[in-house]
Regions:
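N-terminal sensory and localization modules of signal-transduction and trafficking proteins
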Residues: 1-9, 47-49, 155-159
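Membrane-interface helix-start motif
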Residues: 8-10, 199-205, 291-300
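Amphipathic alpha-helical bundle/coiled-coil segments
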Residues: 58, 62, 142-146, 192, ...
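Extracytoplasmic/periplasmic ligand-binding sensor regions of membrane-associated signaling proteins
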Residues: 107-114, 121-200, 204-211, 256, ...
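Extracytoplasmic ligand-binding sensor domains of the Cache superfamily
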Residues: 74-79, 96-130, 142, 146, ...
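Extracellular/periplasmic juxtamembrane segments that couple receptor/chemosensory ectodomains to their
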Residues: 239-300
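Juxtamembrane extracytoplasmic/periplasmic/luminal helical "stalk" adjacent to the first N-terminal
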Residues: 8-19, 23-89, 108-112
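Short, structured helix-loop boundary elements
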Residues: 43, 47, 51, 69, ...
């Protein structure tokens, strides 16, 4: 009679090897699932962190712009109290050294404010905070001048960023139209905000985040006003293709934190990154904070 022991032993060995292989697979799958879960948690933690950071950053930006509007209010009220009713009187009374001193006093101690100006109906800068008498400067080609001249009921306006004609620095302006009693255009009051003031604050923040991070400030129509790191060729451009455009314009969201690898507005390159986008509550401004995966997945 033949013995079945060798076959039984062989079957047992096969089963042991099979169970061993299954155990290895189970451990590997478990490790992968755990790794994915931990990676997802890391991303979620960063989403929350960037959402909070974008809120604080947007509030700081709004407070900075608020200071410019306070100055705009004060200067406008001073001009209205003069009850100027024609262009000749406007030029005569608002071009004085006393008005120059008032403009200087209003922005003194506010380093984020670059200049305060009075502009006549033809675009001539008839007084400003930097010097008196004012050098010959005409601003008729600027977007804010055309907007107020052509739209009597525009209200307050935030301009695109331009090179200031007085000192050559990047500046954007809050402005208000001045009319006579009949509603005829007399001129403008301008308060200029230094782009450097924003890039300085933004730059210090991205230093704490790491290489590859960036912060952008846009006007409501997504015209770029400021960016850190600064790029001259991006200032004044309108974002019509990036994630910020999709969140704000296409989706109509107030804020969002998005994980994406679509091409960037800044250079067209697609890399994995988190983008925290937020609209300011009081002003037509949008802040966008970008962090690449080399930062938020640095431990992976």
């Amino acid at each position: 009679m033949h013995s079945n022991r060798p076959k039984a032993t062989s079957d047992t060995s096969t089963i042991v090897r099979l169970y061993g292989a299954l155990l290895v697979i189970a451990i590997t799958v478990g490790a992968l699932v755990t790794a994915v879960a931990l990676r997802d948690k890391e991303i979620q933690d960063w989403r929350h962190h960037l959402g909070s950071m974008s809120y604080m950053l947007t509030e700081h930006t709004a407070q900075t712009v608020f200071s410019a509007f306070l100055v705009l209010d004060a200067i406008t009220e001073q001009v209205r109290q003069m009850d100027v009713q024609d262009e000749a009187a406007f030029r005569q009374r608002l071009s004085t050294v006393e008005m120059h001193q008032l403009l200087r006093d209003k922005i003194q101690g506010l380093s984020q404010l670059d200049v305060a100006s009075i502009v006549a109906a033809n675009g001539d800068n008839i007084n400003f905070s930097r010097a008196h008498p004012v050098p010959r400067i005409n601003l008729a080609e600027r977007d804010y001048f055309k907007a107020h001249r052509d739209q009597p009921h525009l209200g307050d306006h935030i301009s695109t960023a331009v090179r200031n004609k007085g000192n050559g620095k990047w500046t954007f302006y809050v402005s208000r139209r001045l009319d006579d009693a009949q509603g005829r255009f007399l001129g403008l009051v301008l308060v200029g905000l230094s782009v450097d003031a924003f890039t300085g604050v933004y730059g210090r923040l991205i230093e704490t985040l790491g290489d590859g991070a960036s912060i952008s400030l846009y006007r409501g129509d997504l015209t770029m006003l400021a960016r850190a790191p600064h790029q001259d060729d991006l200032i004044g451009r309108v974002n019509r293709s990036g994630t910020t455009h999709r969140v704000i314009t296409e989706q109509g969201a107030q804020d969002a934190v998005v994980l994406t690898d679509t091409p960037r507005f800044s250079d067209g390159i697609g890399n994995l990154r988190l983008i925290a986008v937020r609209k300011a509550m009081r002003y037509p401004l949008v802040v966008s904070l970008v962090v690449p995966d080399t930062i938020f997945l640095a431990s992976w």
